[in-house]
């Protein structure tokens, strides 16, 4: 007996591995750089050069890039920066990995510390967590009927979520920023940070709209008589449309964005003066778009003239419970410790959202974590004005998801929308944070899916042993379908004036 099926795509995680790598290395200050007198600020980033795949293993090669802003140990006490590369090579065991699989890789620098050994040597310690996984699309055929029109069919209406689009893409954000007229030309770029903030991702017809802003900071030495220290903050709003064939506005996007590379370069203007900062950021997008379809799923068949047995296999089918794009606001006051003077001005602050735990609670998802905040500020010391502090702001937020249960699965995206730091007085700073906490929740249902129908001749002896007339007292939960199938008869809906033969 041939089944009529509906083909649907489901995305499954084939294999996954999590490795932690520790770094503990000494680094010598390059000969072209002066001695270190005092460290101001540090930052680290991971650069992956290659992923080599073999049977069951993936070998990562790359480097941990560490940058340091410091004050020289000379009479001038000028500010300099240096950059060091710590090579990494790590084998990750991924059971079931095969040649040709595409390994997705994520990482998180959980801890980074730089200690001054002496003026020409520093010690770098770091803990980095790598998560590698492979996802593959599985074709699932769901039965919606049989070709034999004489067979009685039992169906159930249901909503099924399928993966309509799964792809990766790259977008670039480029912008030239002119210095204001009251700023001197750039002599040397010392330090910079580039962040993504305020992401808004929407599905449209055959495209994905990505909206956000690049928030950048630059500290430089001016090309004036004193090589004065100058800085600027600038926001670069962007909106780009990424081609995505098969996408539509009613699909549910689950798009993860990472910025593996950003570059800030000094450029010349039309007069040949170095008064332009060019930012070039590379954004990687992993796009998954889900589509919900309404089906009448075939759950059983029978006929009084043959014995039909449905062979089933259990699957977890998903349907949309809720999508909730919520915002979490956090305000806190932090004391400035170990400063050598009173704060005169805050130059720049940046932050990173780190989710420590998620938990399904009544009608929601409890999200807890921290925002790591770095603040660069100036004190009233003309010889050594720049100082930096790092702090962690905890947060706890419940994303509303009515009727969520432990059987549900969810995808969470957390990113920074706004971060502001304001001086309360000369030794206290107020931090205001707005985060986006976006969740898409799917309800999972264990369903026995019919794979095929096996037909056999009726057991004549069993039929002959059955009474010719049966009086049956209906029990709670009975349906005409179950009764008719049990006694090898048909559903006489027209005689019972029932509109739904599956209910009594």
Which residue ranges define each predicted feature?
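Viral structural modules
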Residues: 1-495
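Conserved small/polar residues in nucleotide/adenosyl-binding loops
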Residues: 496-502
């Amino acid at each position: 007996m041939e089944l009529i099926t509906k083909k649907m795509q489901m995305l499954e995680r084939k294999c996954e591995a999590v490795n932690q790598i520790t770094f503990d290395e000494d680094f010598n200050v390059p000969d072209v750089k002066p001695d270190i007198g005092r460290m101001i600020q540090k930052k680290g980033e991971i650069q992956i050069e290659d992923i080599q795949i073999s049977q069951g293993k993936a070998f990562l090669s790359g480097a941990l890039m560490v940058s340091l802003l410091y004050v020289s140990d000379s009479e001038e006490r000028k500010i300099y920066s240096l950059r060091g590369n710590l090579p990494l090579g790590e084998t990750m065991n991924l059971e079931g990995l095969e040649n040709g699989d595409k390994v997705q890789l994520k990482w998180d620098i959980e801890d980074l510390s730089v200690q001054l050994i002496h003026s020409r040597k520093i010690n770098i310690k770091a803990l980095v967590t790598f998560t590698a996984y492979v996802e593959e699309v599985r074709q699932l055929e769901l039965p919606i009927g049989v070709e034999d029109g004489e067979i009685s069919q039992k169906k159930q209406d249901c909503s099924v979520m399928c993966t309509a689009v799964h792809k990766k893409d790259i977008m670039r954000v480029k912008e030239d920023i002119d210095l204001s007229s009251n700023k001197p030309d750039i002599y040397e770029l010392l330090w910079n940070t580039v962040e993504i903030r305020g992401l808004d991702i929407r599905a449209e017809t055959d495209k994905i709209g990505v909206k956000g802003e690049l928030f950048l900071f630059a500290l430089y030495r001016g090309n004036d008589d004193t090589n004065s220290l100058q800085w600027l903050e600038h926001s670069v709003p962007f909106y780009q449309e990424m081609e995505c064939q098969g996408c539509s506005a009613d699909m549910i996007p689950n798009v993860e964005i990472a910025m593996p590379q950003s570059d800030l370069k000094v450029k010349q203007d039309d007069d040949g003066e170095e008064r332009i900062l060019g930012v070039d950021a590379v954004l990687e997008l992993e796009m998954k778009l889900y589509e919900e379809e309404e089906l009448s799923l075939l759950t059983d068949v029978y006929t009084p003239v043959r014995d039909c047995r449905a062979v089933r296999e259990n699957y977890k089918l998903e349907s949309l419970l809720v999508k909730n794009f919520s915002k979490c606001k956090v305000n806190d006051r932090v004391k400035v410790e170990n400063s050598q003077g009173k704060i005169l001005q805050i130059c720049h602050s940046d932050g990173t959202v780190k989710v420590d735990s998620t938990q399904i609670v009544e009608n929601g998802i409890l999200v807890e974590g921290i925002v790591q905040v770095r603040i660069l500020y100036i004190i009233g010391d003309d010889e050594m004005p720049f100082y930096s502090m790092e702090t962690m702001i905890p947060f706890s937020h419940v994303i509303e998801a009515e009727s969520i249960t432990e059987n549900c699965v969810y995808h969470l995206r957390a990113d920074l929308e706004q971060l502001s730091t304001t001086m309360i007085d000369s030794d206290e700073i107020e931090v205001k944070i707005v985060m986006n906490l976006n969740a898409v929740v799917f309800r999972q249902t264990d369903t026995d899916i019919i794979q095929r129908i096996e037909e056999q001749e009726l057991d004549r002896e069993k039929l002959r042993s059955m009474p010719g007339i049966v009086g049956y007292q209906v029990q709670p939960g009975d349906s005409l379908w179950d009764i008719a199938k049990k006694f090898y008869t048909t559903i006489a809906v027209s005689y019972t004036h029932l509109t739904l033969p599956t209910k009594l």
